[in-house]
Each structure stands twice: as C-alpha cells, then as structure tokens.
Amino acid sequence: MSMVYINIFLAFILSLMGMLVYRSHLMSSLLCLEGMMLSLFVMMSVTILNNHLTLASMMPIVLLVFAACEAALGLSLLVMVSNTYGTDHVQNLNLLQC
C-alpha cells in the first residue's frame, strides 16, 4: 500500500473520529462528514486512475453529486434548527418532529 493511500485513509479515519468526538454540534458534524466525502472522492479518483478503470470513471462525479445534495440538505437543516432554537445542537433535532 503506497503512502498516498495511507494518507487518504488516515484523513478518512480522522474525519470519522471527529464525527464521533464533535457529535453534539450539527455544524461540526457536517464539516467532518464533508471531510469524509472528500477523502472518499480522492481515494476513488486515485484508484480509478491507477488501475485504468474506464468503466468506473463516472463514479467520482456521482459521489460529488451525492455529496453536494447531502451538504445542501445538511445546511438547510442547520438553518432551520438555528432559526428555531438559536443553537446548532444535535439534540434539538429530536424536537423537530410533527
């Protein structure tokens, strides 16, 4: 395993650990989730380029589309929670039920 793969895997693990540690605030969770998606995108792109997989060359773009949708939904949820309760604590998400 080359150093590039190890560094990207380490970035993913650090983002995952950040997700576990900073799970009380929604903004911190969204930033850690974006770090995870970025490391997955880079890992997928490097793997496809190194292995010359032409059939899977669209997969990083599909991952970016899903990451953009996730970011838009997460930010809209963050705005809704912060406007309603004045804070971005994740525990307030349970109170948004109808």
UniProtKB/Swiss-Prot annotation:
Per the record, the GO terms for biological process are: ATP synthesis coupled electron transport
Gene3D superfamilies xref list: 1.10.287.3510
List localization entries: Mitochondrion inner membrane
Q: Does the keyword Hydrolase apply?
A: no
**InterPro entries xref list:** NADH_UbQ_OxRdtase_chain4L/K, NUOK/Mnh_C1-like
Q: Where is the chain membrane-spanning?
A: 1-21, 29-49, 61-81
Domain of life of the source: Eukaryota
Signal peptide coordinates: none
**Quaternary structure and partners:** Core subunit of respiratory chain NADH dehydrogenase (Complex I) which is composed of 45 different subunits.
The protein's name in its UniProt record: NADH-ubiquinone oxidoreductase chain 4L
- Upper lineage: Eukaryota, Metazoa, Chordata, Craniata, Vertebrata
